C-alpha cells in the first residue's frame, strides 16, 4: 500500500521525519517495502525565466529562447512548446540532468543548426503528471535559480506491505493510529460531520441477501458537478499509484485508501427502480468497470435494480451505471459484505480489486455512517449539490469481543515486563477499551484479535520488540546428545553413501499423472488428491521411480550421455480407512553410457543389471541390512525385464530391494531409448540393528595376521542360483571365512549338459595364530561339504 508523507501528516500530527517513520513502521510489523522521494530526481532542474522568444531560423515550430537563471548569464535554449514566450517562468534542465520520464541525459547540442544549452520541461517529462502540450508554467514570483526539488518541497512516498491479518491498516488512518500509539505523534480525529438530508431519498435501497450483505446504506446527492478533483486530492491518489478520473470517483477512492472504507457511486439517471443487494440469478452476467463481462453464479452477492446487475458486490462496479462528466445526481452506496463470501466470489471469477482486498479481510462494520458522512461532506464541498436522507437497510455485525486479560502475560508470553499502566495506555491508543478488571473490549476494526495472546502481541509490538532482553539459551554440561532419530540417521547415511558412489540426488514431485502412477501401483490402491494443483498431478506417487525416469528422460533429451540419479523420499499408498500410508524408499536410475567410448575402452558400454545389483547391495549394506543373509529371487514386478531383474529378500517374503533392467514397454512409456537399469530400496523394511540409534560406528581393529585366499570350482546344476552356493560356502565356517565371491561361471566343453562350473574365491582370516596345512584342509572340507548340500561337486 502506497501513500505520501503529506497524506500521513493530514491525519497524524507529527514532527518525525520520513526516515524515523519508516523505521517505526517496520518495528510495528508494517514492513516498509520502499520510500521513494520524487523530488530527488529533480535536483538537477532549475527555476528559470524566459527573457526572449524568437522564431528558429530553420524550423517553423521551434523557438530560440534566452533563459535567465537569476545569475545574469542568460542561456540559449531551443524549445518547441507552443506556450513558450517571453516572461514565462518554467523549469530548465541543464546539461547532465537526467529526464525522469525516459532516463535521457541532457547534453549541449545543436538543433537544426542552433546551439541549445538545455531543455525547458513539461509536466510529463518530469514525471509529475500526464500534461505534455506545453512546458511547465510557474508563478511569476518563483525564485530563479532554485532547484525545482527545493521549490516543490520533499514529499516521500511510503510503500508498506500490509499482512492479511491487518485490515485496519488498509487505510492511511489505521497506519497513523499505530504510529500515534507508538509515540510518533497525535492522531487527528476524523473530520466527518453528519449531514442532515433535506429531502427523502428518491431511490429505494434494500438488502435481500442478509447473509452476503448484512447492511446496505445509501443516499442520493442531486445537483452535483462532476469535474476534475482538487490538486491536493489528485496528489494523494497519484502517490498511491491511482490515476485521477473525476471528482466523484476520486472521492470514493480517497475514502477507501485513506480510511479503508470502499464505497461506490451510481449515476441515478442510469438506474431503474430499487437498488437491491441480492443473490445472482442463473445466467446473469455483469460488464465490470475493467471492460470484461463475468458470468455470475447463484451464490454470489450482486447489486442490481429492475434492469439487471450493476455491481459485483464488494469487488467491482458495473460499467453502464458508473459516473461520468454528465452525472448530476448520484447514489452513494456504503455496505458491509461478508468477508468469506467476497473472497470466494473473487476466487471464482479470478477478479481482484482494491475493494475486494479490503472486504475479504474485513472492513470496520461500525464505520458505515462515518464513511457515508465523509463521502457526503467531500462531495458537497467539491462538487456541490444537495443531500437526501440516509436509507439504512439491514444491520452490520457491531458486537465487540470482550476478552479476559492478565497483564502478566506480557512477561510470560512476550518476554518483556511492561507496566500495567503502559499496557493500558497502548491498548487505549489502539482503540481497545480496558475495564478495571482487565476485561478488554476489542475494537470493531480489529477482527484479527481473538484471544489474550493477540493482546500481548499488540502490547509488545508497540512497546518495541527491540526491548526484548537478549537471553542466551541454557547449555547442558558435557557433549550434547544427538537429536536425530534413527530413521533420520538412516536416511543421512544412505544419502551420503549414494553420493559417494557417484550418484546425483534429484528431488521430484510427490504428485504424478494417473497413468504413470498406475504402472507402479503393483496392485496397491492409488491415493488421489481431492484438490490437485493440476489434473496431470492428482495422484500421490506409489514409487519414486516414475519421477526419476521422467528426470532421466529430460536430461537425456537435453544431451546428457550418462545418467546416475537417486532420490530418497516417501512413497504413498492408500492405508486403512483411506488414509495415506507413507513409506521411506530410495530409488536409483542408471541410463546412457556406463563407460564412454574411448581409445582404451573401445565402444561405449551401457549399464546392465549387475550395475543395478551392485548399487543395491552397497546401499543396503550402508543402511544396515544383513546383506550376507539376503536371497536373490525373481518377481521384481511387471515394470522390470523378466530375465534381467530380481529382488533381494530377507527370507522368502520380506523384499528389501528390487533391481534390474527396465521393461522395454515401461521404457517406451517414459520416452526412454536404450537400456535403463533401476534400483528401488524399501528402507522401511530393513530390520533395525541393536544400537542403530547410535551415531558413531563401532571401533575397528585391523587384523594382526595376514589373510589367506583359496579357490574352489564346483560343478552344480544350472538351475541353482550362484547366490545360494555363495551363501552356503560363507556359512561353512563363520569364524574363519570372512569373504567369498564368484569369479567365474563356465558352461561348455568339459561340463555336462544342464550343469555349470562356478569358481569361488574364499578369504580366510586367522585370529589367534596363522593357519597350518591341517587347519586349511579342515576348512576346505567344510566348504566342500556345505556346497555338497546343494548338489555341488568339487571340480577335479
UniProtKB/Swiss-Prot annotation:
Q: Which SUPFAM superfamilies match?
A: Anticodon-binding domain of PheRS (SSF54991), Class II aaRS and biotin synthetases (SSF55681), Nucleic acid-binding proteins (SSF50249), PheT/TilS domain (SSF56037), Putative DNA-binding domain (SSF46955)
PROSITE patterns membership: B5, FDX_ACB, TRBD
Describe how the cofactor binds: Binds 2 magnesium ions per tetramer.
- The record's top EC class is ligase
Key word Chloroplast present: no
Cofactor requirement: Mg(2+)
Domain B5 span(s) in chain numbering: 398-470
**Pfam families assigned to the protein according to its UniProt record, in alphabetical order:** B3_4 (PF03483), B5 (PF03484), FDX-ACB (PF03147), tRNA_bind (PF01588), tRNA_synthFbeta (PF17759)
Q: What chemistry does it catalyse, as a reaction equation?
A: tRNA(Phe) + L-phenylalanine + ATP = L-phenylalanyl-tRNA(Phe) + AMP + diphosphate + H(+)
- List, for all copies, the residue spans of the domain called tRNA-binding: 39-149
**EC numbers, comma separated:** 6.1.1.20
Superkingdom of the source species: Bacteria
Residues bound to Mg(2+) are 448, 454, 457-458
Q: What GO biological process terms does the UniProt entry carry, in alphabetical order?
A: phenylalanyl-tRNA aminoacylation
Q: Name one GO molecular function term.
A: phenylalanine-tRNA ligase activity
The places in or outside the cell where this protein is found are: Cytoplasm
Paired cysteines (S-S)? none
Query: What keywords are annotated for this sequence in UniProt?
Result: Aminoacyl-tRNA synthetase, ATP-binding, Cytoplasm, Ligase, Magnesium, Metal-binding, Nucleotide-binding, Protein biosynthesis, RNA-binding, tRNA-binding
Give the record's family classification: Belongs to the phenylalanyl-tRNA synthetase beta subunit family. Type 1 subfamily.
Q: What is this protein called?
A: Phenylalanine--tRNA ligase beta subunit
Q: Which gene encodes it?
A: pheT
Amino acid at each position: 500500500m502506497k501513500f505520501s508523507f503529506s497524506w500521513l501528516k493530514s491525519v497524524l500530527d507529527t514532527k518525525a521525519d520520513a526516515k524515523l517513520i519508516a523505521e517505526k513502521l517496520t518495528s510495528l510489523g508494517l514492513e516498509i517495502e520502499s520510500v521513494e522521494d520524487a523530488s530527488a530526481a529533480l535536483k538537477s532542474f532549475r527555476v528559470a525565466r524566459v527573457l526572449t522568444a524568437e522564431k528558429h531560423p530553420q524550423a517553423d515550430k521551434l523557438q530560440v529562447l534566452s533563459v535567465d537563471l537569476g545569475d545574469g548569464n542568460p542561456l540559449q535554449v531551443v524549445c518547441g512548446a507552443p506556450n513558450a514566450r517571453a516572461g514565462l517562468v518554467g523549469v530548465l534542465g541543464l546539461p547532465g540532468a537526467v529526464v525522469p520520464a525516459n532516463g535521457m541525459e541532457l547534453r549541449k547540442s545543436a538543433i537544426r543548426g542552433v546551439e541549445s544549452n538545455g531543455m525547458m520541461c513539461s509536466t510529463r517529462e518530469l514525471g509529475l503528471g500526464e500534461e505534455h502540450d506545453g512546458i511547465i508554467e510557474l508563478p511569476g514570483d518563483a525564485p530563479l535559480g532554485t532547484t525545482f526539488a527545493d521549490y516543490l518541497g520533499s514529499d516521500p512516498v511510503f510503500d508498506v506491505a500490509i499482512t492479511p491479518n491487518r485490515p485496519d491498516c488498509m487505510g492511511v488512518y489505521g497506519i497513523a493510529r499505530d504510529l500515534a500509539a507508538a509515540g510518533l505523534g497525535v492522531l487527528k480525529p476524523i473530520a466527518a460531520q453528519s449531514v442532515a438530508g433535506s429531502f427523502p431519498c428518491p431511490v429505494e435501497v434494500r438488502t435481500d441477501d442478509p447473509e452476503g450483505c448484512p447492511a446496505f446504506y445509501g443516499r442520493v446527492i442531486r445537483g452535483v458537478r462532476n469535474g476534475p478533483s482538487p490538486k491536493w486530492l489528485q496528489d494523494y491518489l497519484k502517490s498511491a499509484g491511482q490515476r485521477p478520473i473525476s471528482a466523484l470517483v476520486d472521492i470514493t477512492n480517497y475514502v477507501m485508501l485513506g480510511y479503508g472504507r470502499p464505497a461506490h457511486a451510481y449515476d441515478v439517471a442510469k438506474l431503474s427502480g430499487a437498488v437491491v443487494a441480492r443473490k445472482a440469478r442463473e445466467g446473469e452476467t455483469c460488464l465490470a468497470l475493467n471492460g470484461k463481462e463475468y458470468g455470475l453464479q447463484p451464490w454470489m452477492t450482486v447489486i442490481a435494480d429492475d434492469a439487471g446487475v450493476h455491481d459485483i458486490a464488494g469487488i467491482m462496479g458495473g460499467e453502464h451505471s458508473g459516473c461520468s462528466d454528465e452525472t448530476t445526481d448520484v447514489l452513494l452506496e456504503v455496505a458491509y459484505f461478508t468477508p468469506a463470501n467476497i473472497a470466494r466470489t473473487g476466487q471464482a471469477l479470478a477478479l481482484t480489486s482494491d475493494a475486494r482486498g479490503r472486504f475479504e479481510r474485513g472492513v470496520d462494520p461500525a464505520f458505515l455512517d462515518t464513511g457515508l458522512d465523509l463521502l457526503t461532506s467531500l462531495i458537497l464541498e467539491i462538487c456541490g449539490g444537495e443531500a437526501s436522507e440516509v436509507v439504512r437497510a439491514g444491520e452490520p455485525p457491531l458486537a465487540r469481543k470482550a476478552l479476559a486479560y492478565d497483564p502478566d502475560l506480557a512477561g510470560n508470553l512476550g518476554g518483556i515486563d511492561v507496566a500495567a499502566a503502559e499496557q493500558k495506555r497502548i491498548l487505549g491508543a489502539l482503540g481497545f477499551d480496558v475495564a478495571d478488571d482487565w476485561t478488554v473490549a476489542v475494537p470493531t476494526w480489529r477482527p484479527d484479535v481473538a484471544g489474550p495472546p493477540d493482546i500481548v502481541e499488540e502490547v509488545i509490538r508497540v512497546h518495541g520488540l527491540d526491548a526484548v532482553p537478549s537471553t542466551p539459551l541454557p547449555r547442558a554440561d558435557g557433549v550434547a546428545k544427538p537429536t536425530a532419530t534413527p530413521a533420520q540417521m538412516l536416511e543421512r547415511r544412505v544419502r551420503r553413501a549414494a553420493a559417494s558412489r557417484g550418484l546425483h540426488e534429484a528431488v521430484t514431485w510427490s504428485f504424478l499423472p494417473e497413468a504413470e502412477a498406475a504402472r507402479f501401483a503393483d496392485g496397491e490402491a492409488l491415493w488421489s488428491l481431492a484438490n490437485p494443483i493440476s489434473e496431470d498431478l492428482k495422484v500421490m506417487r506409489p514409487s519414486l521411480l516414475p519421477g526419476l525416469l521422467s528426470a532421466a528422460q529430460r536430461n537425456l533429451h537435453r544431451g546428457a550421455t550418462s545418467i546416475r540419479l537417486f532420490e530418497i523420499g516417501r512413497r504413498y499408498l492408500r492405508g486403512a480407512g483411506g488414509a495415506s500410508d507413507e513409506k521411506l524408499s530410495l530409488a536409483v536410475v542408471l541410463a546412457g553410457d556406463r563407460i564412454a567410448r574411448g581409445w582404451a575402452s573401445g565402444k561405449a558400454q551401457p549399464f546392465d543389471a549387475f550395475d543395478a545389483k551392485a548399487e543395491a547391495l552397497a546401499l543396503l549394506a550402508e543402511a544396515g541390512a544383513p546383506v550376507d543373509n539376503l536371497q536373490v529371487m525373481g518377481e521384481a514386478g511387471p515394470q522390470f525385464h523378466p530375465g534381467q531383474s530380481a529382488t533381494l529378500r530377507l527370507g522368502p517374503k520380506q523384499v528389501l530391494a528390487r533391481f534390474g533392467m527396465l521393461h522395454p514397454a515401461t521404457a517406451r512409456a517414459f520416452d526412454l531409448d536404450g537400456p535403463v537399469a533401476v534400483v528401488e530400496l524399501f528402507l522401511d523394511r530393513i530390520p533395525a540393528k541393536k544400537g542403530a540409534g547410535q551415531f558413531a560406528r563401532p571401533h575397528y581393529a585391523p587384523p594382526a595376521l595376514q589373510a589367506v585366499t583359496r579357490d574352489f570350482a564346483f560343478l552344480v546344476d544350472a538351475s541353482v542360483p550362484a547366490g545360494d552356493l555363495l551363501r552356503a560356502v560363507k556359512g561353512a565356517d563363520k569364524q574363519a571365512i570372512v569373504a567369498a565371491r564368484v569369479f567365474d561361471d563356465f558352461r561348455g566343453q568339459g561340463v555336462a549338459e544342464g550343469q555349470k562350473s562356478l569358481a569361488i574365491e574364499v578369504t580366510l582370516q586367522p585370529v589367534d595364530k596363522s593357519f597350518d596345512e591341517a587347519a586349511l584342509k579342515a576348512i576346505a572340507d567344510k566348504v566342500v561339504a556345505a556346497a555338497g548340500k546343494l548338489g555341488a561337486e568339487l571340480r577335479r
